[in-house]
A protein has these predicted regions:
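Intrinsically disordered, low-complexity sequence elements enriched in Ser/Thr/Gly/Pro
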Residues: 17-18, 73, 83, 102
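Compact soluble domain cores
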Residues: 1-67
Length: 106
């Protein structure tokens, strides 16, 4: 799936409510990371994710994973550079958008 197909499908699935965050990063819940790093709620984070486009796409030249189905984006949110990794996968109720990472870029 190319980036344009991915973004179109991602937005549709998010609008349908077929979305979720991974539960934790480094032992911290994403709800807390979003508030601490950006001052936003999980609902606002999904709004930011829906506005991602090909101009925010970031290509990792040394990926730590081989799963090519995830796309990485970087964008400013409230003055802080965010690292956002999302993919579409099969969930219990069909396809869903999974936000693997949404945190301050290091």
């Amino acid at each position: 799936m190319n980036i344009y197909e991915f973004l179109k499908k991602m937005r549709r699935l998010i609008n349908e409510g077929n979305r979720r965050f991974v539960m934790k990063r480094d032992g911290r819940y994403y709800y807390n990371i979003l508030i601490e790093d950006f001052g936003i709620s999980d609902t606002k984070a999904w709004e930011y994710i829906k506005t991602l486009n090909e101009h925010f796409l970031w290509v990792d030249m040394k990926p730590n994973y081989t799963d090519s189905s995830a796309f990485i984006f970087k964008r400013l949110i409230n003055g802080v550079m965010a690292y956002i990794k999302v993919k579409i996968e099969e969930g219990e109720n069909g396809e869903e958008v999974v936000c693997i990472s949404f945190h301050r870029d290091y």
